[in-house]
Amino acid sequence: DQIDRVVSMLRDIHPGAVFLLTTPPECHRRVRRKGKKKYYYTYVTNTKVEKVAETIRRYAVGKGLACWDLFSISGGRGSAKSWVKYQLSARDRIHFNIKGYELQGNLLYDAIIKGYNDYVGK
């Protein structure tokens, strides 16, 4: 398992490190299609991302690691279209643009602060 190899390697180098795994957001992939006279490109949902997100979530639970589920937080299945619609995706439809990364950072910050406040409030 690639995730386990990376986490194990990092633990060997930094035994006291604390890990926060994150899942990827849904994204598109570019596909080539044949038109009447020539080929053209279009974008379709990359269905493998949901499987990757589920694998990361399961791994984190199994190993007792924290996991921030960006896949679900960003809207889950079908959400990539919204990120494009609201101009939060880069032109490649895989990565966010500056506004998208700022939103991602704010969402992560809010989650960390909420977790901390829940922890100290116990």
What does each model-identified segment do?
Residues L10-I13, A17, G115-D118:
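Secondary-structure transition/capping motifs at alpha-helix termini
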Residues T22-T23:
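Alpha/beta-hydrolase-fold catalytic nucleophile elbow
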Residues C27-K122:
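Catalytic His-Asp segment of secreted/periplasmic serine-dependent ester chemistry enzymes
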Residues D1-I3, H14:
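Bulky hydrophobic/aromatic packing residues
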